[in-house]
Every structure is written in structure tokens, then in C-alpha cells.
């Protein structure tokens, strides 16, 4: 039995995620296998609007946005694994555990996010996420998302 991996371009990502500029933080999906894992890329540009204030003279990609990029990657994996949502449904970011930041991400870096499906329990799906730059871990966390109807 062979396992089939897939890629996604930005146009396909936009069809799946509700996020838009400047908050769409996944540029391309390099590979994924449904219900297993996904590897995606965020190209970090000095033109990102938050670099004006974070930090002037020493721009650093905000850690919370690294987590958000990984959460968006989990959303893509969930959409591709479970299928399209019913009208009025969304995937919500439901929680995060064990988040650790190992080194800064700066303009010019290419951040690779790898998220791995762990389990679904009581409507929550848990994923392990790791972000790297040049093969070195910059952040890791366990994230949960839930499929729910809009309020």
C-alpha cells in the first residue's frame, strides 16, 4: 500500500481558510497526507506590517504569529482530512499547550511548519506543531481545534 502526498498553492489555501491579508500566514503547502501530517511554508518578508513596531531597528516575527501560522496549518490539514464544512460551521482554534519558543524568526527567513494529527476526542482534534528555520526548531506546541457552528 502506498501513501499519497499532495501540495497546495496559495489559491487553494485561500479557498480553505477564512483568513486574508495581513493575517493569512501560510504561503504554500509543501506536502500533506490526509489525517496524518502537513508541511507548509511562511516566507517572512520585511514588508510585513507588524515589523514597524516589533521591533524598530531589530525586527522579530511575533511568537504569537508563529503559533497562529501553525494553527492555520492545522486548519488546512483538518479541512483536507474531514472535508468541507457545512454552511454555518467553522473550525475554531480551541487551545494550546506546551508552547515553547527556541529562537527568533527574522525577515528573510523561510519558516517551515509541520503539524501532525494526534487524536480526536469529544469534538476536539489535537495536533502537534513544530516550526523550523534552516532545519532548527523555532517553536513547538500542541494545539487543539474544534468544529462548531457559528454563534
UniProtKB/Swiss-Prot annotation:
Q: Cellular component per GO?
A: cytoplasm; membrane
**Where's the active site on this chain?**
54
Into which EC class is this enzyme placed?
lyase
Gene Ontology process terms (BP): fatty acid biosynthetic process; lipid A biosynthetic process
Q: Where in the cell is it found?
A: Cytoplasm
Q: Which UniProt keywords apply?
A: Cytoplasm, Lipid A biosynthesis, Lipid biosynthesis, Lipid metabolism, Lyase
Enzyme Commission number(s) of this protein:
4.2.1.59
Q: Which GO terms describe its molecular function?
A: (3R)-hydroxyacyl-[acyl-carrier-protein] dehydratase activity
UniProt entry tagged with the keyword Cytoplasm: yes
**What chemistry does it catalyse, as a reaction equation?**
a (3R)-hydroxyacyl-[ACP] = a (2E)-enoyl-[ACP] + H2O
Q: Which Pfam families does this UniProt record tie to the protein?
A: FabA (PF07977)
Q: In the UniProt record, does the keyword Lipid metabolism occur?
A: yes
NCBIfam families reported in the protein's UniProt record: fabZ (TIGR01750), PRK00006.1 (NF000582)
Its annotated function is as follows: Involved in unsaturated fatty acids biosynthesis. Catalyzes the dehydration of short chain beta-hydroxyacyl-ACPs and long chain saturated and unsaturated beta-hydroxyacyl-ACPs.
Which family, according to UniProt?
Belongs to the thioester dehydratase family. FabZ subfamily.
Could you identify this protein by its name?
3-hydroxyacyl-[acyl-carrier-protein] dehydratase FabZ
The gene designation is fabZ
Amino acid at each position: 500500500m502506498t501513501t499519497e502526498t499532495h501540495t497546495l498553492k496559495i489559491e487553494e489555501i485561500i479557498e480553505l481558510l477564512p483568513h486574508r491579508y495581513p493575517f493569512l500566514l501560510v504561503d504554500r503547502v509543501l506536502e500533506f497526507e490526509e489525517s496524518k501530517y502537513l508541511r507548509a511554508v511562511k516566507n517572512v518578508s520585511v514588508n510585513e506590517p507588524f515589523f514597524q513596531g516589533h521591533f524598530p531597528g531589530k525586527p522579530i516575527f511575533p511568537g504569537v504569529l508563529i503559533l497562529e501560522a501553525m494553527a492555520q496549518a492545522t486548519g488546512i490539514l483538518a479541512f483536507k482530512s474531514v472535508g468541507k464544512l457545512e454552511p454555518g460551521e467553522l473550525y475554531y482554534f480551541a487551545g494550546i499547550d506546551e508552547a515553547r519558543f527556541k529562537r527568533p524568526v527574522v525577515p528573510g527567513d523561510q519558516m517551515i511548519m509541520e503539524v501532525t494529527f494526534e487524536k480526536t476526542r469529544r469534538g476536539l482534534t489535537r495536533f502537534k506543531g513544530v516550526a523550523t528555520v534552516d532545519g532548527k526548531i523555532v517553536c513547538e506546541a500542541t494545539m487543539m481545534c474544534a468544529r462548531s457552528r457559528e454563534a
